[in-house]
Amino acid sequence: SGLKDSKLLRPTRRQNLVEPVKQWLVDSQVAHASPSEVDRFGIVGALRLAGFRALAQLAKRGHHPDSIILDGRDNWLSSADLFLSLADAEMADLMAISGELAPVTMQVKADASCAVVAAASVLAKVERDSLMAALPDPGYGWASNKGYAAPAHREAIATLGASEHHRRSWHLPGLDQYRQRLATGEN
C-alpha cells in the first residue's frame, strides 16, 4: 500500500493515498488549533484541544473509538490538569460531547510502525498542507514551504514580520532581523 509516516512520502503520493485511506478507515477527523491557541495554551494544550475537537466531531457522527494511539511518549490527551484549564468553556463542551475517553496508548514513532497512525498522519499532513497553500500570501511562500522555516520563508519574515498565521510565542527565524530593521528605520 505504501502507507507510512507522511513525512517520508512525496506530496503526490500522500495525496493519492487520501481516498484509499478514507475507504479503509471506519471514520476519521482532522482537527486544528490556531496559532493564537498554541500561544495561549502552549503546544501540548493546543494538541489536547485539537484532539478533543476531533473526538467531539467523531462522537457527533456516533463514533467513539475503543482505543486511542498517540504518536510519541507523552499522553497529552488525558492529562487534563497539566496543560489546559478545564474551566475553558469550549474544552468543557468538547469533553462532554466526546464522552468517556477511551484508553490511550503512547507509541514512539507510531506513524512509522502502526498503519492506522500512519493513515492519520497522511490525512492530517494533506489537510494541513492544503490549508497552508490556500492562505492569503503577501510573500511568505505558504504554498511552497507550508509554514516550515525554509530559507525563503525566513527571509520573508525578516522582510514582512510575523503574520496572524505565525505562532508568536515561538522564536521565529528572521523576526529579529525584521525588528532590527524597524528599529533602525530601514525599509
What are these regions (language model features)?
Residues 1-187:
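RNase H-like, Mg2+-dependent phosphodiesterase core
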